[in-house]
Amino acid sequence: MGKITAIKKLKRLYRVDLSDLDEEKIYLCEDTIIHFFITIDKEVSETDLEEILAYDQFAQGKSLALYYISFKMRTGAEVRKYLLEHDINDTDQIEQVLSVLTENNLINDKSYAENFIEGKISMGSSGPYQIKQKLLTKGISNDVLSEALKEIYSEEKQIDVAYKLASKLSRTYGTRLTLKQLKDKIIQNLMNKGFSYSVSSIALDSLELEADEENEMDLLYSELDKVAKRYTKNYEGYERKQKITQALARKGFSYDDISSALRDYTFPE
């Protein structure tokens, strides 16, 4: 049987000196001191010491976790990682901390996911697939986030957000791209932001975009000048026209417009 010989208050913890035990001194938080009525001359067995140290891991873990979540909402996985990074290494005690905080609704992955999704919808910047990937990196389970997305981010809302993004892209690139290029860019951009092809297509169709023939031809002639310079160095005649036609078609210009432009085009020498 050992005995507590001294207790000293430090900045954050208490140093407890022991005699006749394997440990000569231990460091405990105030919660542990109070919970076990730690006082000088109190007798402590090795079994008592193990219990005290186990509880202290829980108490310190809970204190750290409460500090961590005081700034903003955190997921259970984020809190677990934070505790491990701050030397709370007893996994059983970590899970107990998470259990207590979850029971008191201080950690709620579903609420976290719902708030995150609503924020992204409000910002109008992300589709469901992008949101899902971000939440997965925060340790939220696939089941929890799938349920939250289903409840909050309906297809109707997705189309509304995608439409606003598509409209903005149309205003930005409308005069710089052909109609085909613009449509391709809008679809690709929306899918990169996490919208399905189906939702992206519906949003695009809702814009009812039409070609500006004069702008299309201006863009064609501008691109024709660039392509002609490149291919005139190594090709001539029919082969050159074929190379140029193929290059312009890949950029979204129609074969009829390309043929019309080439008919009276003067190639650089």
From Swiss-Prot:
It comes from the Bacteria. GO terms for biological process: regulation of DNA repair. It is found in: Cytoplasm. Keywords: Cytoplasm. Disulfide bonds: none annotated. GO terms for cellular component: cytoplasm. Modulates RecA activity. Belongs to the RecX family. This is Regulatory protein RecX. It comes from Lactococcus lactis subsp. cremoris (strain SK11).
